[in-house]
């Protein structure tokens, strides 16, 4: 079977919402939603191998440490394992006073009773009721009409009131999800929710949660936003209701749907860390939270050690996070492209502490989420001078002059082409040493004596040439001019730069020389030494030897 030439014969577009006076497109997200993690329930039930109790507890503690205040811990009536986990959290004191446990149940009395029993002794708890409401589920799965579906929800809501009254020591919050909300007729979804509200009788001080799932993502995010805005306008007792979003990622727009839903007036977001969940996953709470953060809003969730959080999630879920996953993937703060690297390097150079973040290609400062700058720039055959210069400067304190960056990038390019792999900072530094610092043929500087008198310098350089030692002597206005005067070839210095590497008594000097030998093409040399004069002499010999070697290679 192949893709249809006319898919409209098999699939139909989801109808738009009649909301000509919609207001959400002109809104911004300026308030932080209530966050609810469903990792231990929705996320766990989607795993090939569900978490055991130890993994669940480890995950729970991670969610608490991040700052998630509402955590859906399990489906207690589904298994003894889930029931026991809730008991462990309560009896062993794993629920902080500012954190609320949430559990899920279907709309059957035996399951509801078991669910409330699992929560006995909890200081506060959210009990989450659901039943599917959309036409396809009513017809295909349950063989129920609208009245039957509504009756299921209302009867279950009454049972919530009954069993909660038997445990008055717990502060109860009730939550109802018209499952498949986004595929349900809006008027009917409202009708069912209104009926549930009537039973639960919420107040502004004791609100109910109406969770409106895109159980399966069936339309573009703007349609979901229209549904949320319409619902918020029309639901009864809006001041006593928290509207909660629960999006999935079937069409790849779970984050967008959530953000537009918040613009449309929602108060709360359910999801999973890094987007685990049924099929293509629930909305990623991390992405939504850090999207807020990069708009200048503190999301109330702390991902200062995002790699530590990822490690827990990967080990508990046994699913690796994709290297391109927003904010946390191994490659999301990495640039291989030469133009990107150059822009990033310039951005880091100009970025001042305490100023607005404006580094190109990096929407967030990696340091804010515990990432080092080490992996920001990586070098492969597509890389340019900016990335190479950045790595040498960050890792080794070596600041190559601009024209030398261009020259050395060609050396690195040849090496990456030869290897067919990316190069690490260590490999680039090794190549710099081999190409420049160890360029000692045909002339190797062994030692030198420098004398200065009345503004004039004289140099006696001991040089190893073809197996024997020679002394080159010269005079000039400065040390370099004196050394050049003593060379056996005509050398013209085009540019000279120097800087310190490190500080204090252990600091070294780096010197860079650009020169031409006998009128040939200009080349660069590098010298590093504790003494700045020695460093400059080594740089001159480095450039001299490289020039002569290139001339000889060209002649051959």
Swiss-Prot record:
GO cellular component terms, A-Z: cytoplasm
Stated name of the protein: 2-isopropylmalate synthase
Class of enzymatic activity (EC top level): transferase
Pathway assigned in UniProt: Amino-acid biosynthesis; L-leucine biosynthesis; L-leucine from 3-methyl-2-oxobutanoate: step 1/4
Function summary: Catalyzes the condensation of the acetyl group of acetyl-CoA with 3-methyl-2-oxobutanoate (2-ketoisovalerate) to form 3-carboxy-3-hydroxy-4-methylpentanoate (2-isopropylmalate).
Keywords: Amino-acid biosynthesis, Branched-chain amino acid biosynthesis, Cytoplasm, Leucine biosynthesis, Magnesium, Metal-binding, Transferase
Domain of life (superkingdom): Bacteria
Family affiliation: Belongs to the alpha-IPM synthase/homocitrate synthase family. LeuA type 2 subfamily.
Organism placement in taxonomy: Bacteria, Pseudomonadati, Pseudomonadota, Gammaproteobacteria, Pseudomonadales
GO molecular function terms attached to this record: 2-isopropylmalate synthase activity; acetyl-CoA C-acetyltransferase activity; magnesium ion binding
Positions of region (Regulatory domain): 439-556
Record flagged with keyword Calcium: no
Coiled-coil intervals, chain numbering: none
Listed SUPFAM superfamilies: 2-isopropylmalate synthase LeuA, allosteric (dimerisation) domain, Aldolase, post-HMGL domain-like
Annotated disulfide bonds: none
Reaction catalysis annotation: 3-methyl-2-oxobutanoate + acetyl-CoA + H2O = (2S)-2-isopropylmalate + CoA + H(+)
Localisation per UniProt entry: Cytoplasm
EC number per UniProt: 2.3.3.13
Pfam families reported in the protein's UniProt record: HMGL-like (PF00682), IPMS_D2 (PF22615), LeuA_dimer (PF08502)
Annotated residues for binding of Mg(2+): 42, 246, 248, 282
Gene3D superfamilies: 3.30.160.270, Aldolase class I
Required cofactor(s): Mg(2+)
Start and end residues of each Pyruvate carboxyltransferase domain: 33-307
A GO biological process held by the record: L-leucine biosynthetic process
Subunit-structure text: Homodimer.
